[in-house]
């Protein structure tokens, strides 16, 4: 990774950890007061901004059960289905997940210095042990769902600023830790406008346009806490 990419990765990690003020003051919160500043709101660049969260990652119907999908839903400060936390407190290098047996040697070789996280469902701030993930090694159009946070690879998310340096640190692709394609990796994607449909799943699709023109529906940002 180039020095510039490393700097952007650090900045994006700080943004996700809530330590960088690029997100500013958001106009709406997706964290309940009980979850507060521990919560992280993951939002699509296409349908939200740091100043107006719009639509954020949400557990479908708030059900804390393995296999329940995660979707994009309108941000709400009173819906515990939108309460997500980073269990380690913030991003860590992919190499740390490799040392813990959570990603493969190939993933570590390609992404080792880039930041990565797990994202745990924690309604009202209470951890469930279930993380947003994919059920198997990532494949085209696979939907995200809750899976045990102990599952290696599939529960790890890489903040892939190297594949979209022009939009970092505010927006970045989020690549699954089970990935085996390092040219066009499987990244979080949404299809359709969540304002016009009842159910908008988050799915895996090959990252396109990288590194110069990744589409907005494959770029994500993060905000923290209540307002």
What are these language model-derived features?
Residues 31-227:
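Lectin-like carbohydrate-binding module/patch detector with strong preference for beta-trefoil
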Residues 1-30:
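Secretory targeting and sorting signals
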């Amino acid at each position: 990774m180039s020095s510039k990419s490393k700097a952007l990765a650090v900045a994006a990690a700080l943004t996700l950890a809530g330590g960088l003020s690029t997100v500013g003051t958001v106009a709406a919160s997706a964290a309940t007061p009980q979850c507060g500043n521990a919560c992280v709101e993951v939002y699509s660049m296409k349908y939200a901004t740091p100043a107006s969260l719009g639509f954020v990652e949400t557990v479908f119907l708030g059900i804390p059960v393995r296999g329940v999908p995660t979707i994009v839903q309108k941000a709400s400060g009173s819906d515990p289905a939108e309460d997500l936390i980073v269990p380690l407190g913030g991003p860590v290098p992919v190499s740390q997940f490799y040392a813990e047996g959570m990603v493969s040697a190939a993933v570590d070789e390609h992404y080792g210095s880039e930041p990565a996280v797990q994202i745990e469902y924690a309604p009202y701030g209470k951890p469930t042990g279930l993380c947003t993930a994919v059920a198997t090694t990532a494949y085209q159009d696979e939907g995200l769902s809750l899976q045990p946070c102990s599952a290696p690879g599939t529960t790890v998310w890489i903040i892939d600023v190297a594949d979209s340096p022009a939009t970092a640190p505010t927006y970045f692709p989020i690549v699954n830790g089970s990935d085996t394609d390092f040219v066009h990796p499987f990244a979080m994607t949404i299809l359709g406008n969540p304002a016009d449909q009842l159910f908008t799943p988050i799915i895996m699709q090959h990252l396109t346009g990288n590194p110069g023109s990744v589409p907005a529906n494959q770029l994500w940002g993060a905000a923290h806490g209540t307002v």
